[in-house]
């Protein structure tokens, strides 16, 4: 019975994960960039999958720009330095603009909006917004990591007579540090993906490089969307 309960709990986590629109979008993103890596920009089945998945993902993002607009007008966390607040708000504004413009890209790619030249221009503007938002996100994570490192050193001094790795507060800060470091890596790699999509350095950042970086960041995003596990309850025999 305990095995059945454990299986049910695991399946429940899978259902919870797949019910999240953001998680499904990131799975599709992994397929998109995986196909781009395989195709390397050459015509064929992989490129067709890349293009169709790219278009399908835009439906997931309709009106998603409202999320970052809400973040833009929300008050910052108490005690956050002004520099990090401004970078965070810039990230929200740029990402919201990217997602807003992406709706017009979808209209153009589906043929509803007929002006191809203007659609291509909107694509580039939106990608520049995404690249800039990724730069801001990376700088925010760097700043937060610096603040976190400082607070961890202070806490370590306070706990010098005990094992700091057994302290819940210190373990929580270590977990936050790992999460922010992963977010920093993702933001840096997203900048490379944006450069590849904009073809700013086509000789160095080829479609295959873009696909590889995009696939890795997609896996990171999928991991970040995983639901937290409830602590295991020991059952007496």
Swiss-Prot record:
User: What's the domain of life for this entry?
Assistant: Eukaryota
Subcellular location per UniProt equals: Peroxisome membrane
Tissue/organ expression: Expressed in seedlings, leaf sheaths, flag leaf, panicles and spikelets.
The residue ranges for the Lumenal side of the membrane come to 114-204
GO process terms (BP): peroxisome fission; regulation of peroxisome size
What are the annotated GO cellular component locations?
peroxisomal membrane
* Name of protein: Peroxisomal membrane protein 11-1
